[in-house]
């Protein structure tokens, strides 16, 4: 656990967080304004809405410094694995390889369910009780102005922690720390392994333990979550024995005994790579592979000259980046296995083979 951090005072806030941001307003005795809607772009993806804060916004610079000098120094629970340096999805899954029965739970609208009043209460201990601007705006109020957004959400005007803001992931982990600790205590008492990756909660037990399939278990977790006004998406409740697939990552203990299981990727997770390698061996062009396999198309614009040369260079670089991305991805499994010895041996051989194939193509084609 990191050392206890000192409270942030006015001098630190102005010298480190604000710096030159809102300099004119601050010198004129004005408050730090809330984030303007015209500084934010909305991106919809399936059932989720992401918010992107313009890099030109003074709040973007403030968020960056808040992240570096405050949020990254606040201790988190040992159960949380998302948005943390040197922790990955594999770290989130690995503790469950020792078990046989698995349960996955999902929180409804995780980021946008974070109560801003709870955010205020949680972060109040990190700021001294001072005004940033004399009797107009406290340090805590200035902080809230830079990390929240007031906009229409589900048809209602609301102030919330936006999914997509630079500071939101760390804030979510800090807010959830209390819940993580309570869930962990419950799990320790009932011999359950617990890990969390953002809004994904995973639980596992040994063969003889039947608690994960009980109504009691769901009710207890729901009750703990409700303390901070979070709700379970009960339609996404998943309980499996021996094998469970989470986003294409598979944990399995085929023997269903108390020996160690392992982790692999589902076959569908690498389909695009296999298709790309097949097309490359056929001699297909980079353009054909990018469009057919990865659905990457060059946006239309007016060419002054050398259209074919420009397109060839564009699609070649895109294909190269895709292959290098897959190489890094597969290599992460090999590296992880060296320390934790938990990757499926057949899948591990596949990783080594595919890495070799990609490197061979890089040497020949690019």
What are these regions (language model features)?
Residues 104-108, 164, 168, 190-208:
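Catalytic palm active-site di-aspartate
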Residues 135-139:
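Beta-propeller folds
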Residues 1-132, 143-165, 174-184, 211-366:
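Right-hand nucleic-acid polymerase module
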Residues 187:
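Conserved hydrophobic residues forming the short capping helix/wall of the S-adenosyl-L-methionine
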């Amino acid at each position: 656990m990191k050392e206890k951090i000192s409270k942030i005072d006015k001098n630190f806030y102005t010298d480190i967080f604000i710096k030159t941001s809102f300099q004119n307003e601050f010198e004129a005795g004005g408050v730090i304004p809330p984030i303007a809607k015209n500084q934010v772009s909305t991106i919809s993806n399936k059932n989720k809405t992401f918010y992107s804060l313009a890099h030109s916004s003074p709040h973007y610079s403030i968020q960056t410094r808040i992240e570096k000098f405050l949020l990254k120094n606040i201790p988190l629970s040992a159960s949380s694995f998302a948005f943390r340096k040197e922790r990955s999805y594999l770290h989130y899954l690995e503790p469950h390889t020792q078990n046989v029965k698995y349960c996955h739970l999902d929180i409804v609208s995780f980021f946008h369910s974070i109560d801003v009043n709870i955010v205020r209460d949680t972060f109040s201990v990190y700021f001294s009780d001072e005004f940033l601007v004399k009797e107009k705006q406290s340090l805590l109020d200035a902080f809230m102005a830079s990390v929240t957004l007031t906009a229409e959400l589900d048809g209602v005007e609301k102030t919330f922690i936006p999914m997509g803001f630079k500071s939101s992931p760390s804030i979510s982990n800090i807010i959830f720390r209390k819940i993580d600790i309570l869930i962990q205590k419950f799990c320790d008492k009932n011999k359950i392994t617990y890990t969390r990756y953002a809004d994904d909660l995973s639980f596992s037990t040994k063969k003889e333990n039947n608690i994960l399939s009980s109504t009691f278990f769901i009710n207890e977790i729901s009750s703990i979550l409700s303390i901070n006004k979070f709700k379970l998406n009960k339609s996404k409740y998943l309980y499996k024995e021996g094998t469970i697939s989470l986003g294409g990552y598979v944990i399995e203990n085929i023997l269903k005994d108390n020996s160690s299981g392992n982790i692999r990727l589902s076959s569908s997770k690498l389909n695009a790579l296999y298709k790309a390698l097949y097309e490359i061996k056929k001699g297909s062009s980079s353009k054909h592979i990018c469009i057919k396999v990865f659905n990457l198309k060059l946006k239309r614009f007016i060419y002054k000259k050398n259209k074919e040369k420009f397109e060839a260079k564009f699609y070649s670089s895109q294909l190269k980046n895709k292959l290098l991305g897959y190489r890094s991805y597969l290599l992460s499994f090999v590296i992880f296995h060296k320390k934790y010895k938990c990757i499926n041996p057949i899948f591990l051989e596949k990783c080594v083979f595919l890495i070799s194939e990609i490197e061979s193509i890089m040497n020949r084609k690019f």
